Amino acid sequence: MSVAGMRVLIVGGGGREHAIAIGLSRSPSVGSIHTSPGNAGTRSLGVNHDIGPSEIDGLVELAIEIQADLVVIGPEAPLV
């Protein structure tokens, strides 16, 4: 996998996910940022998708569809 142009999926829609998106958007390695569900701030940095953090099957389908190279889980709840 080439690092340049990496497709990133960030799961969550709060301030934490917005901050992660800001940081990742500054990286020359990141080509696109997708956030699900995202918020108004993340919309300005990439593409928001209407799939909640607890909708595991939908998130898996999305990650496959966008060919995500990296998935960042923002909220703790989906990890438990």
Residue ranges of model-derived segments:
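ATP-binding N-terminal substructure of ATP-dependent carboxylate-amine bond-forming enzymes
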Residues: 1-80
